[in-house]
Amino acid sequence: MEYMAESIEHSPGHILCCECGVPISPNPANICVACLRSKVDISQGVPKQVSISFCKQCQRYFQPPASWVQCALESRELLALCLKKIKAPLSKVRLVDAGFVWTEPHSKRLKVKLTIQKEVMNGAILQQVFVVDYVVQSQMCGDCHRVEAKDFWKAVIQVRQKTLHKKTFYYLEQLILKYGMHQNTLRIKEIHDGLDFYYSSKQHAQKMVEFLQGIVPCRYKASQRLISQDIHSNTYNYKSTFSVEIVPICKDNVVCLSPKLAQSLGNMSQICICIRVTSAIHLIDPNTLQVADIDGNTFWSHPFNSLCHPKQLEEFIVIECSTVRDLKRSAGAGVISKKHTLGEVWIQKTSEMNTDKQYFCRTHLGHLLNPGDLVLGFDLANCNLNDEYVNKMNSDRVPDVVLIKKSYDRTKRQRRRNWKLKELARDRENMDTDDERQYQDFLEDLEEDEAIRKHVNIYRDATIPVESDTDDEGAPRISLAEMLEDLHISQDATGEEGASMMS
């Protein structure tokens, strides 16, 4: 006879809950989950309703103790901000999960679902899920409050240039737009001889001053004025002013250098033409094609002025033009321009066509001029030059005429211009009636000088048909490859509504 061993199944033991008597698996507390939750609330101390401040003007949330941050709805940044509001109570429990519960954007409510754990009776760990309701309260931030009170700026940059032309400011405006340096400005104000930039902090203004020093030759002075002070906390409220002065030289200006400066630049002639102003002043000697760059420090050490202003430009017609092939260079001469050709021309004023008076001069435009072409220049022979360096020069070394650039039909150039520029949104006051002509001069400079326009964002104007890079007269134009597509421009920047064109 064989005995069969009975299979014994081991099942976990059960105990009765000490509160309600329900059979449960053994646990350190000897109590069921329902009774444990009724006796212990691990979320006690965590507020179920919290207020959070929101500025409607700038769309920012208040982050204690004194900062305002930009956060999108249901973003990680906003979730972190909400959790910081209950950071102290949450430090007593273990946060397992957190997330937003969807609410209507206009409801002024933010709901955050939290999952927490905490050790309770005899080492038992209890997990609980609950929702914290955040009430969004409107509160104006300090920056917006100062804007509404017309006391919004903490620092201002006053950019000035003592010239009759604004070419440098137009170039400066395009660089500011390209590199986004206008984003921290509260207000930009245009006056007759410059621009004012207003900032909410001194640090933003200092960053702008450093940017200006890197793109144009300039110098600045800083000052500050005490607005208020608190003797109890020893805090002071200042308004800072940065006065930035740009060198008073623009493109196409004729200048006379001091003998010492001309000698230090490679014995170049004192009478030079400014062909470009970027981070330095680029000069060319029309008699030898010698070029030199003068930075801001050199200019302020050896200052010089423009001999003529743009309104004194006169139109000449080319009678005869020849290229100078063999140019003798003296010892110690500087760099010669490879982009220009030295030429000798006979010219006559278009206003004196009924006379036989002609002028002879050398020019750096030998590669552009042909008999019959029109060219713009300054008549130094019949001009009253009030300059200390010119007065000390030998009259034989002062040219009768200095040619600046070839003249084209401006009306045709404007009609065929298939590109546009953006402009800064700014307040204007006391605008000169000559501003439009000066702006057209700047646009023509961009077409003629590739070195300048490579730093400028140029946008294609879809309303103008695409043509060749040069027109019938040979006037330079900007190629389509150099233009950008702009989907935000709705007005032409060269028109009256150009001030609002900023994306």
UniProtKB/Swiss-Prot annotation:
Protein's UniProt keywords contain Transport: yes
Function: Acts as an adapter for the XPO1/CRM1-mediated export of the 60S ribosomal subunit.
Motif (Nuclear export signal): 480-489
One GO term of the biological process aspect: positive regulation of RNA biosynthetic process
A Pfam family: NMD3_OB
Keyword terms of this UniProt record: Acetylation, Cytoplasm, Nucleus, Phosphoprotein, Protein transport, Transport
Protein name: 60S ribosomal export protein NMD3
Motif (Nuclear and nucleolar localization signal): 405-422
GO CC annotations, alphabetized: cytoplasm; nucleolus; nucleoplasm; nucleus
GO molecular function, one term: protein-macromolecule adaptor activity
Signal sequence annotation: none
